[in-house]
């Protein structure tokens, strides 16, 4: 399971307010 590169992407998107993209990466 890759959760190292995705974690950084999810965090940056979460800060911008993108909940839909975060769920897609996860």
Swiss-Prot record:
The source's domain of life comes to Viruses
Query: Can you name this protein?
Result: Probable early E4 17 kDa protein
Q: Which UniProt keywords apply?
A: Early protein
């Amino acid at each position: 399971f890759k959760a190292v590169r995705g974690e950084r992407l999810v965090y940056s998107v979460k800060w911008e307010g993108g909940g839909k993209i975060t769920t897609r990466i996860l």
